[in-house]
């Protein structure tokens, strides 16, 4: 059976059509709060159950419990604070407010809690550093002075150019059941696939019924692959190198926090809500720079025996000239001089120079997809 939703119930916080119509007709009567793109995406993920069991942004009790214990106040595992910040609240506890992204009302929120917090404490506990060069820490330091907690009802979603590739948890759960999959392994990615990724995915697929490739779409930094390139690259990989009906590709919009081990747990919870029973935890999962050890995230899973999804720890793959194929350090006896590490950065630089990567690094069909774009990279 596909996994149970985190907390036992798949959350749905979408305003019914008549309620939505009434709220929008009365929108001038509500206090108005502007939110950024990331919070709008968080609202979608709350509303569609990706963040189950959350029904809204964290109250003080849950926020402090997540910081200190990596659990909600009811002891449910939860590692990343999903919060709404404001600089100066112009409303009170008990009020209903409307959350806007630019001119679009995204959600109604029932204000349960307004509270202050220490930014350095937030940063140190979640990211294990107070260094403002860390992108997640920099984001915390730019937040408003207050946090607002309470349940939400989604009214509108941001435009989604990849809507046809988007599946919600309620849809993936039905799809996995229709395929007869009792076990499903999820793989998160922000890159086009190379042979190292394929090795890890197929190693995991050996032990389960189906593979769920779940690319993260969202704001990217300069030099990253564009979202459409990642999607097209996986489509051609599935067509040529995977058996039919063993893999599903569906995207999710999400703002990366780069919180390393804590975020690895969060990513597993998200995929549990999609119905996955297993989750591939990569090397330096959700890390950035040198803030976390390469396999630090693996150790943190030991603290969550009640997580409800099984982590799969598959070591980084490389090409061995002696073995003549993709291997990892556990199964290859040969000296380092025979190993060719497949670095995403190295591949990206080769492609930028117009060089075709060797076939032991990247499938030629994937390279042709990348080459078909005038500029496959974010500028």
Swiss-Prot record:
It catalyses: sulfate + ATP + H(+) = adenosine 5'-phosphosulfate + diphosphate. SUPFAM superfamilies: Nucleotidylyl transferase, PUA domain-like. Pfam families: ATP-sulfurylase (PF01747), PUA_2 (PF14306). One of its GO terms (biological process) is sulfate assimilation. Keywords: ATP-binding, Nucleotide-binding, Nucleotidyltransferase, Transferase. Its EC number is 2.7.7.4. PANTHER family: PTHR43509, SULFATE ADENYLYLTRANSFERASE. This is Sulfate adenylyltransferase. It comes from Pyrococcus abyssi (strain GE5 / Orsay). The gene is sat.
